[in-house]
């Protein structure tokens, strides 16, 4: 992990590549988080299942999942699991299992 943190090739700022482009451009953290939040919200709004065919509340979001890092602490894993489940995600996995 220390090698990764101190690597000369480590990205220190978010970058964006427009569709069809072969060039990456540096963007601000605010823009990166806004873009991520926008895409997550659009996908969840379009694919969230509140009730199943029988009318039972299920609150599922099946089109997006979360892959967690294997180097995370148990506490981080617990919070990640709670966060993703609160959003309705069912597909949550950990890199350590792969």
Identify the meaning behind each predicted range:
Residues 1-98:
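N-terminal export/assembly segments and adjacent metallocofactor-ligating motifs
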């Amino acid at each position: 992990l220390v090698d990764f943190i101190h690597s000369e090739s480590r990205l220190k700022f978010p970058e964006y590549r427009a569709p069809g482009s072969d060039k990456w451009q540096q963007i601000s953290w605010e823009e990166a988080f806004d873009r991520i939040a926008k895409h997550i919200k659009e996908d969840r709004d379009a694919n969230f299942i509140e009730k199943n065919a029988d009318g039972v509340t299920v609150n599922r979001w099946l089109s997006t999942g979360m892959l967690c890092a294997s180097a995370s602490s148990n506490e981080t894993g617990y919070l990640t699991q709670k966060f993703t489940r609160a959003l309705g995600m069912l597909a949550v996995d950990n890199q350590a299992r792969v």
